[in-house]
Amino acid sequence: MRKLLLAVGLSTLLIGCSDNEVGDVSLGVFTLKDIKITSLHDDKIEGVTCHIASIEANLSLSDPSDSSISCRQTGDITPEMIAAIDKSKSGEVVFKQSKSIFFKTMKVRRIFDPENQTLLYLSYTTKETDGSFKHSLSTVPLWGTKAYNAFQSNQVADQ
């Protein structure tokens, strides 16, 4: 049983390894903590790029839950892309990274706000037991994209 738990723990750590690291800021020699900045490209909405800043503790079994996220439109967003996403109130997970060998995970979830024609990217940390559930939110308005114009045309056609 121990070997199985160790294998699962190590594999989840490898899932969190990212070659999308764009920044690494040391918080000091004696803290042994760094702020890592990674870029995330949404697989379904190719015109969106998010940057996530989170703290990594080098000699710790668990990284702090603090993180921030900033997402921007960096390319075209088409009606076909919006049609392909989960439009439920809970949206869908677009990124997941292990933050601890004790089942703590940072997730980024995409949620669509149809009334305001906006994509929301919610970064949060989950832990199977008690813990602090810190979160951060970034929005990407569809204003000025092909997806927004198509939505507006459909509303006018329905009237």
Predicted regions and their residues:
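Sec-dependent signal peptide recognition
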Residues: 2-7
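Residue-level signal for mature regions of secreted extracellular proteins and peptides
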Residues: 10, 43-44, 64
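C-terminal motif of bacterial Sec signal peptides marking the signal peptidase cleavage site
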Residues: 13-16
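Bacterial signal peptide processing site
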Residues: 18-20
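Post-signal peptide N-terminal segment of mature Sec-exported envelope proteins
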Residues: 24-43
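Extracytoplasmic
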Residues: 32, 45-47, 66
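Mature extracytoplasmic domains of secretory-pathway proteins
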Residues: 49-116
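C-terminal partner/receptor-binding element of secreted or periplasmic proteins
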Residues: 115-159
